[in-house]
Each structure stands twice: as C-alpha cells, then as structure tokens.
Amino acid sequence: MKLPIYLDYSATTPVDPRVAQKMADCLLVDGNFGNPASRSHVFGWKAEEAVENGRRQVAELINADPREIVWTSGATESDNLALKGVAHFYQTKGKHIITSKIEHKAVLDTARQLEREGFEVTYLEPGEDGIVTPAMVEAVLRDDTILVSLMHVNNEVGSINDIAAIGELTRSRGVLFHVDAAQSAGKVEIDLQKLKVDLMSFSAHKVYGPKGIGALYVSRKPRVRLEAIIHGGGHERGMRSGTLPTHQIVGMGEAFAIAKQEMVAENARIKALSDRFFKQVSDLEELYVNGSQTARVPHNLNLSFNYVEGESLLMSLKDIAVSSGSACTSASLEPSYVLRALGRNDELAHSSIRFSFGRFTTEEEVDYAAQKVCEAVNKLRELSPLWDMYKDGVDISKIEWAAH
C-alpha cells in the first residue's frame, strides 16, 4: 500500500489509464490532432469522427440521442448554460426559477446572478436527509415558473433526489427541469428516454475522465431552446462556440463507455468498501451520518464526529486525502452551507468529514484509513475539555458562555 491514500473521489478522480491512452492518440503529429471543424481535409474529418464517437458514447450511458449532447468545459459551464440559457430565452413567459439551498455553487451563484438581472429565485430547504421532495417543489410552483434546477446526487452528502417523480410534476405543469448529474453519472442509472428531464449537466473528471470537459444534455423532444453564453463560430449548433478539444472529448467518451460497462459491478464493490469502512468507525461515540441513510450513493460517506473540530481531524489524518465540505468551498472556515441547510448545528457541521471511495480504492486502504480515523478522533477528544464535560453528563448546549 502506498501513502498518501486518496479518499476524495467526489472532488475529482484520476484519469483511467485506458482513457489516457485514447487521449494520447489525439495529440501528436502522427495522431488524430486535426480541428474537427476543418471540413476540407482528412485531418478534420478524422477529428470530427472521433468527436462524434465520443458524443455517441456519452449519449449511450444516459440513453439519449447523440444530437442532444452539447460539449462544454465542464459541469460548471453546463449549469451556467442551462440556467442562463433558459432564463434569457424564456423570460417573456415568466421570470421565476426554483432551486434548492444545497445545490452546487455553480447553480447557486448563477441563480444569484439571474436575481441581479431581475429574475426571482425560490431556494427550497431540503429535508434533514438532504432530499428535495416533489411535494416541496409543487408547493412553490407558480404560473410564471419557467425552470426547476435540482441536483441528482448531492456532492457533499451523497443523497439522491427522486428526479423521475419531480420530472413528472414539472412536465405536467409545462415547466423546464434541469438536473446537475455531475455526481451521479456512472454511479446511478440514468435513462433519459424515460426521465422527464429537459437539461442535464455532466462532467468528465468525476467519471475518471480528464478535467476541462463536460456536456449538457438538451432535450429535442420536447424541444428546449437556449440562448448561448459563448459566441464565435457557431459550433455545437450555435449553443456553445469554440474549437472542440478532440483529445478531451475522446477521453470523456471513453470514460463514459467504461462507466456504462462496469457500473453495476463497481457499485457493488464500492458499497462493500464503504460498509467495511463504516463498520470499523461506527464504534466511535457521537458519530453522525450526514444525508440520507437509504437514498444515497455508496461512494460518498459524510460523517460528523461530535466534539472534534473537522479541520484538526483533517490535519491529524495527514496521509489520508479527505475533505470537509466541497472542494470548491472548503478553503473557507465557514461551516458547510449544505450541512447547515440540513439542520445540523454549527458544531456538527464543523466536525464533518467527507470520505469518498472510488475505482482505485482498496480494502487495505479502507482498513488503514478507518484505523487512523479512530485513533485521531480518540486522541483529539482526550485533549478536549468539551468532551470531558460531555462524559461527565453536562449538557453543553445549555451552557451560557461568558465573554471576557
């Protein structure tokens, strides 16, 4: 076993060697390096063929028509294009958008920007399990609602929203439905022939593909119209201009093809690893699982260790890569906005750690990590006066601390 151990697969994944090989074939002078938009020679034709093959591979994982896949630079851009594209195109129909308080910042910050432009956004509060129910959405739907945007799997706590039921609701009311599937693609089955989802965002680097490439599914039946946010050249049917990065697209296609092939077996393996890890740490007192206990992906295990500061626990686990909060926001010392929205108090939110398991995680790594977590938590609690008080039966929440 090699140290350090990577248990932060929800932040990013390494590129699968099979993917890297396919990408390498598209870079050098004797490879497939042409511009896919060059229509006048074989270099361009070959590149375009590779791009269309990648488009087909992405579409096959989610059972969509390849013509419904638009290449972007990643899920953040896909979210921006979906929200701004719909808002600007359909604003004459209405200016009300619904999302939730625990979306990724790519959706929340875009929603805030749309508010500055005069749109009205309702931010739903999820249940304690991190799930937004169809009833919650129905309660705030209005005649001027044009879009509902909700994630499929939450990036911090791994809970799964019932997008099938929410899609039935939005479709029946004539409201467009966008789903951020960055954390669910390759982990949860997605069938866009059955799901009533109009727009769906994807990222390659969460599925063992390269960073810097993603896609947006844009439904053709019923047809969804978008106003572009990047102009110049009219690539991707005018929805997203810019020379297509053949090697990135080939990488994303191959990554999604591998995911389709291996998803069922891999999910079972990851669940066994996650259960094995949890069993070993579950003897710790005052341990809380964040998010849903049942509707969750096994890849993500978000735990709060009460009376332990999450940052100090991170420091103690120096040869284990895990995170507190999402990678995009974990630089700030604010407690996770996701956990606070789930009703966790600041202490528990501050003591949370996200463990995420993936394709290259081994049993040996999981055992080592679990042992180190138990050692670190016990050691930090020994140093904590709050832990002593808790053990002595003092209800810490009732104490009024004096300021000096």
From Swiss-Prot:
PROSITE patterns: AA_TRANSFER_CLASS_5. Pathway: Cofactor biosynthesis; iron-sulfur cluster biosynthesis. One of its GO terms (biological process) is [2Fe-2S] cluster assembly. Its EC number is 2.8.1.7. Its cofactor is pyridoxal 5'-phosphate. The modification N6-(pyridoxal phosphate)lysine is found at K206. One of its GO terms (cellular component) is L-cysteine desulfurase complex. The active site is at C328 (cysteine persulfide intermediate). [2Fe-2S] cluster binds at C328. The keyword Lipid metabolism does not apply. It comes from the Bacteria. Keywords: 2Fe-2S, Cytoplasm, Iron, Iron-sulfur, Metal-binding, Pyridoxal phosphate, Transferase. It is found in: Cytoplasm. It catalyses: (sulfur carrier)-H + L-cysteine = (sulfur carrier)-SH + L-alanine. Belongs to the class-V pyridoxal-phosphate-dependent aminotransferase family. NifS/IscS subfamily. PANTHER family: CYSTEINE DESULFURASE (PTHR11601:SF34), CYSTEINE DESULFURYLASE FAMILY MEMBER (PTHR11601). Homodimer. Forms a heterotetramer with IscU, interacts with other sulfur acceptors. This is Cysteine desulfurase IscS. It comes from Pseudomonas putida (strain GB-1).
